[in-house]
Amino acid sequence: MTATTITVQGTHIAWYDAERATVEISAAFDGAKRDEVFARATQTAADVTAEITPLHSPDAGPITWWSSDRVNVWSERPWNNDGKRLPLVYHATIGIRAKFNDFEALSRLVEKLAVMEGVNVGAITWDLTDERRKTVTDDVRRLAVEDAVQKATAYASAAGVGTPSVIAIADPGMLGDGSGGGIGPAPIMERMAFKAQAMDAGGGAPLALSPEQIQVSTSVDVRFSTP
């Protein structure tokens, strides 16, 4: 009896709790005098780093890593509603990033910085530790292959042929017959946005950050042969 070839794509999606959070902070000012704008930005950035440095410990946290950009200063001449050029306006901004392993400490810092003049708290990126990321990536890949085996076994049973044996495994699209597609060759780690519950107008409830889980997904093409 002629062997039957079965080619399927296995997929797996898993969700994991975030273990790290990186917050983006900036000190930004603008005005008519370059030196004044520069000085305000650098002083405010120094005030922010003064809040960060006592919290920094690579091993213990709550801040495991942080960095600060050089000050960026530029100018522009805006237009008014009548189409006339206005005097120069100078802008200065300094970016700061900090990675946390303690989300309550992150909430407290964000709450404190949010009321500082010239300070903007931007995106918060949620992630896993490097070690955890490698572990879950291996798990997701293994489960994607198991999904492919289950599919091929079901197809073989429905077709009335023998138990399928693996003859090729590849990232999507690499089996050479155009059978790929799908999610992609490498596990995709989707870092979901955070939810924040800010203080009410009376200042009663503290800021609470609630990270969504991180999605890790992958696909694999597997070719089987049946007797």
PLM feature spans:
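Short, charge-dense linear interaction motifs
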Residues: 1-227
